[in-house]
Amino acid sequence: PRTFSSAASDVYKRQLLINVGTPDEPTVKSVRDYLREFLLDPDVIDAPYIIRQLLVRGIILRVRPKKVAPLYQKIWMEDGSPLRVYSDRITKSLNSMVEDVEFEFAMRYGNPSIKFGLESLKQKGVEELLLLPMFPHYAQATTESALKHAYKQLKLINWQPKIIEMGHFETDEEYVIPLTKSIQSQIDKDTHLLFSYHGLPVSHVKRIDKSKNHCQQLDNCCAIKSEANQLCYGHHCMLTTQTVVGLLGLKEEQWSLSFQSRIGPVKWLEPSTTNKVEELVNRGIKKLAIVAPAFLADGLETLEELDIGIREHFLELGGEELTVIKCLNDNQDWVEGLSKLVDKKFSQSATA
């Protein structure tokens, strides 16, 4: 394996914390515990406290765990949740690849917890800590929630290392080049490529726009670069898409963008993946490939929602061939890219 040495190793010991989330087991109880922690996070459902409690405890947790647990059972791997298995593999690969940085992974929701990861790093005498939420596109419900929770846990364990944050990396070549390569081998000139991103309530992206004149106010607002949408999730998704489309050399009619994994009756980013697939079949698309760039590791949203649910839907509508492209997972190009992203961030910190 190739070995990378991060910059300024004589100045600090540097460590990495990776933040993701999954149930411990594919059981109703475990899924309920996971969903409770996940959905009661005010950064995920930003309704007033009482309404959020009533919605989650009174409705969602009574119904959804029974529906979701069997779906997890379909995709569960021998060593556990796919998300946890791939996170563990990525961490081990990074630790063998990078000389002077020790990597730990933790889950924002579920186990191993962020607190557990931080305590482990504290015991090892870490002086400089990079917090890396494993989400290429910034969102309050993912990136912001993970960082806020990490700072809260740091305070609880009374630890004050030098902190570096990795906020988002939607167009960094270390991410988009491995992503593009993973797509390239799965499509040909007759394939329509659908970029399916995790959905987000419109209220979350509108909150980012302090001007109140851009988000959902302009046609195709996510495609227009502006001071107002520098941290907009929809804009970041569009930037990734445009970058990959450019690298692949696709024409406008050869690709589409959509959003999946909706929960609840609020307004979400459009179009939905389900509706977009229907539209594409109605346009005469018979050969479709779907890539989910917001997910760095395969999980329920890709292995079940796309590869089982959307596949069945596409074929029932009259589609003929569907390829669901695997997430980057522990792909060697991506792991090397991630190590370079980390090195770049530490180098920037050392010269700041």
Tell what function each PLM region has:
Residues 1-8, 12:
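Single conserved hydrophobic/aromatic residue that forms the stacking wall/gate
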Residues 37-41, 208-229:
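A solvent-exposed, charged loop/short amphipathic helix patch at secondary-structure junctions
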Residues 90-102, 157, 240-254, 317-319:
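A structural motif corresponding to the C-terminal end of an alpha-helix
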Residues 104-179:
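Long, hydrophobic, well-ordered secondary-structure blocks that form the structural core
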Residues 118-119, 264-285, 309-311:
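A short, acidic, amphipathic alpha-helical segment used as a generic capping/interface helix at domain edges
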Residues 159-173, 220-242, 257-260, 309-337:
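Short, flexible loop segments at boundaries between secondary-structure elements
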